[in-house]
């Protein structure tokens, strides 16, 4: 349950931050120090990072984008803002070491946020893509304790190399698909009914939109990509704000984040 003093919450997902996305990473850091300051709670619903191969990533090598983001989140949390992070399909290996370094809490997927009596289902969204059977099989495997333990026992350079190979394979598979798998609205409706809720917020699909169906709202978050060509449809960075006083959902472009490098 959200503390009764919370009035303004910000939701983001699919930022895919890392050394490979310098403009997006810089934009998020600017936003965190500006517009995001108004939020009592920040909810990052998956894929904060493009890849995460283990919390020991923060203990080796010279500081990079991963270190910068974690330090900024820690400073943000230290100033009194609650930071909640959910696993995505890219950074499902985030663990308590990361959470401790960032002064953040890890959210289960899915979970229910109770804000002033309103129950809101939060999820990354990948588990709703029921038509993508191969991915769901992979998801079940890599979220298992046995697979993760085996992967994390490998040396860090080997894990980084494997993660890069998996991302390349994923991009190749997506390029061969006629359409990307989308969230199943019937599955989402079942989740909402099971949670006794009428609201859902998720990301993953990179298709920001409000979906209304039989009095149920499914709000899909935007991805962030400030490294894409300026002016293009994919050059965007948006946060969803929920204001408790009016229970208003407002998707806002992040002006501080969208300054082109």
Where are the language model's segments positioned?
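Core catalytic region of metal-dependent phosphoesterases/phosphodiesterases
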Residues: 2-12, 17-115
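Hydrophobic/basic alpha-helical segments enriched in Actinobacteria
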Residues: 14, 20, 39, 107, ...
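Tryptophan-centered motif/residue detector
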Residues: 28-31, 52, 138, 147, ...
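Residues that form or immediately flank small-molecule/cofactor binding pockets and catalytic motifs
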Residues: 90, 111, 127, 223, ...
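Conserved beta-sheet core of the metallophosphoesterase superfamily
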Residues: 101-108, 119-121, 126, 131-137, ...
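A short acidic, often aromatic-flanked loop/helix-cap motif at beta-alpha or helix-coil junctions
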Residues: 112-115, 226-227, 257
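Active-site-proximal loop/helix segment associated with metal-binding centers of metalloenzymes
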Residues: 123-184
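Short, solvent-exposed aromatic-acidic interface loops
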Residues: 250-261
